[in-house]
Amino acid sequence: MDKRGIELPGSTKYGPYSAGVQAGNTFWLSGQIAVDFEGVKDQTQGALDKIDTLLENAGLTRENICFAQILLDDIDDFAAMNEVYGACVSELAIKPARAAFAAAALPAGALVEIVVQGTK
């Protein structure tokens, strides 16, 4: 099986992992956070922008995403996150399946973390 890493140059890593991995026609992107921004809306957009860059680096687009998992530091931020996420996927013919939930804490004080996986 052909397996390769997908990297995000200049991005801070918080552990020993790849930003993404593609194996055959399937890909997985590690959770993306954007702690350089304040507020859940801006952090959500920042994480989505990183995902777009990773997808582009792998020759993929948002259309290739099959599943998104969204972790929130505070479930009360769900509506604000959902507004930004909804705008991101509004043009997709088939929206990704998704799970969203609160976690006790996220890396580096992030308010939101987004994980995606999909296929070519």
Predicted regions, residues:
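N-terminal presequence-like segments and the immediate start of the first folded domain
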Residues: 1-66, 72-120
